[in-house]
């Protein structure tokens, strides 16, 4: 008889769920673009169950991770650190992974992984610089969609420095560049390098070991990924499942619990 497990990743800006069959096959997934403290987690759970044509009672084990994991007491059988879940999820997609760079809405994590287990990490959760929130703020100033940043930045022909690592000061720099008539596409490329520089500082403290993978919502932005590759001097892999990585790791740990 098959074992189905549910992994829930309650982030600061999005709620993600994955249902796994026998610890091997992804049956369904869901993403709701609001996170902890909202209806997002409940909606994401409802959506993933609907997508799988299953009920909550069909789940052998449910495990929650992420910033808002403790809000799911009574719904999840267990809560677990997102660091461990990201290490596990990344190892499922990329068996040779040794470094995970996770850029979420409100924090950045660089995790060293050995055989699916976290062995070291560095994290920035005190400042928005280098996070998805930073990109949201910058896109708002530039009056562009955050989803368009990568494509626009790729057209840049002139190097513009956005040197402040603080979001407030970087905001002032961007406004100053706009007032000088600097092309938006060059500013965007500079913003991508600014995000990368913040992440590189964390990565160098952990130590970069190949294979390197990028997870989290910002992994979709190939401008940031390219700036990281340039700054670190390594190829960085990603996947369409990058934003679901924490939920995937949670579902895998749930399977380990259920299969005991």
From Swiss-Prot:
Binding site for [4Fe-4S] cluster: 127, 166
Keyword check for Amino-acid biosynthesis: no
One GO molecular-function entry: ATP binding
The organism's place on the tree of life at top rank: Bacteria
GO BP of this protein: glutamate catabolic process via 2-hydroxyglutarate
Further remark: HgdC (CompA) seems to require NADH to be functional.
Functional summary from the UniProt entry: Involved in the fermentation of L-glutamate via the hydroxyglutarate pathway. HgdC (CompA) has a very low ATPase activity, whose the role is to activate dehydratase HgdA-HgdB complex and then maintain an appropriate redox state via an ATP-dependent electron transfer. The dehydratase requires only catalytic amounts of ATP and substoichiometric amounts of HgdC (CompA) to be functional.
Assembly, per entry: Homodimer.
Protein name as it appears in the record: (R)-2-hydroxyglutaryl-CoA dehydratase activating ATPase
Phylogenetic classification of the source organism: Bacteria, Bacillati, Bacillota, Negativicutes, Acidaminococcales
């Amino acid at each position: 008889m098959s074992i189905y497990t549910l992994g829930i990743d309650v982030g600061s800006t999005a709620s993600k769920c994955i249902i796994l069959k026998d610890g091997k096959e992804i049956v369904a997934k869901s993403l709701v673009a609001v996170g902890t403290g909202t209806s997002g987690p409940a909606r994401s759970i409802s959506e993933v169950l609907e997508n799988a044509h299953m009920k909550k009672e069909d789940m052998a084990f449910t495990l929650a991770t992420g910033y808002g994991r403790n809000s799911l007491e009574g719904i999840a059988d267990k809560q677990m650190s997102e660091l461990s879940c990201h290490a596990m999820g990344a190892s499922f997609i990329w068996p040779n992974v040794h470094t995970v760079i996770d850029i979420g809405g409100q924090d950045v994590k660089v995790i060293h992984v050995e055989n699916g287990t976290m062995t070291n990490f560095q994290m920035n959760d005190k400042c928005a610089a280098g996070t998805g929130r930073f990109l949201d703020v910058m896109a708002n100033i530039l009056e562009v969609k955050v989803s368009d940043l990568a494509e626009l930045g790729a057209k840049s022909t002139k190097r513009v420095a956005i040197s402040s690592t603080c979001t407030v000061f970087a905001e002032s720099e961007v406004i100053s560049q706009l007032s000088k008539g600097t092309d938006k596409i060059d500013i965007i490329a500079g913003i991508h390098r600014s995000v990368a520089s913040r992440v590189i500082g964390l990565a160098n403290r952990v130590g970069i070991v190949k294979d390197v993978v990028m997870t989290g919502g910002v992994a979709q932005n190939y401008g940031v990924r390219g700036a990281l590759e340039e700054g670190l001097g390594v190829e960085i892999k990603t996947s369409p499942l990058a934003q679901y990585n924490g939920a995937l790791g949670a579902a895998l740990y749930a399977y380990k619990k259920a299969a005991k």
